[in-house]
C-alpha cells in the first residue's frame, strides 16, 4: 500500500473527556473540585469562627487577624486565581474578600488588647463617647453584615449540605 499525503489515524475506544463534578446546580472541573477541597480545608474553620464571633463583645481571638492574613498572603492570594469556573471563582473571591474586610476591624482603631485569665484577647474600644459611637455606628453594623455575608457564602461553598433547604431570610436591619 502506497500512501501519499497526510494520514488520519483513529483510535478505537472512548473519546477522552474532561471530568466534571457536580457542585450544587452547576458542574465544575475535576481540577476546580480538588482546588475547592483544598480551599475548604484551609478556610472552613476560619469562616465558621468569623461567623460565630461577635466583634462587639469581649473575647475576640487575638490571633484572628493573623489567621486570616497569613492564609491569604502565603497561599491563596495567587492560588485563588486558578479556579476556572466563573461562579465558583466568584464565591471564592467573595469569601476571601469578606474575610479580608473583617481584618480592618481587628486593628487598633477598633480593638484593644485585654488580659484575661484565658490569655490575651481583643475587646472593642469603648472608653469614650466617640469610641462608643464608632462601636455602635460602624463596628457592629459592618461586622454583622460581613458575618451574614460569610454565612451565605459558606452555604454556597457547601451546596450538598444545604440541598433542598430554603434560603436564609434573616439579614441585618436594612439589608437583603
Label for each model-derived stretch:
Residues 21-176:
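Long, low-complexity or tandemly repetitive, helically biased scaffold regions used
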Residues 1-26:
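Long, low-complexity intrinsically disordered regions enriched in small/polar
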Amino acid at each position: 500500500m502506497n500512501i501519499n499525503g497526510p494520514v488520519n489515524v483513529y483510535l478505537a475506544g472512548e473519546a477522552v473527556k474532561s471530568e466534571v463534578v457536580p457542585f450544587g446546580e452547576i458542574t465544575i472541573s475535576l481540577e476546580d473540585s480538588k482546588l475547592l477541597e483544598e480551599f475548604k480545608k484551609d478556610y472552613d474553620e476560619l469562616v465558621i469562627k468569623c461567623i460565630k464571633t461577635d466583634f462587639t463583645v469581649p473575647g475576640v481571638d487575638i490571633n484572628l487577624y493573623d489567621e486570616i492574613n497569613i492564609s491569604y498572603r502565603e497561599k491563596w492570594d495567587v492560588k485563588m486565581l486558578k479556579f476556572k469556573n466563573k461562579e465558583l471563582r466568584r464565591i471564592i473571591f467573595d469569601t476571601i474578600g469578606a474575610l479580608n474586610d473583617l481584618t480592618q476591624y481587628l486593628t487598633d482603631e477598633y480593638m484593644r488588647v485585654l488580659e484575661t485569665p484565658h490569655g490575651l484577647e481583643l475587646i472593642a474600644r469603648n472608653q469614650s463617647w466617640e469610641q462608643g459611637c464608632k462601636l455602635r455606628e460602624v463596628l457592629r453594623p459592618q461586622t454583622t453584615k460581613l458575618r451574614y455575608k460569610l454565612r451565605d457564602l459558606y452555604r454556597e461553598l457547601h451546596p450538598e449540605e444545604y440541598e433542598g433547604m430554603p434560603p436564609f431570610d434573616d439579614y441585618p436591619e436594612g439589608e437583603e
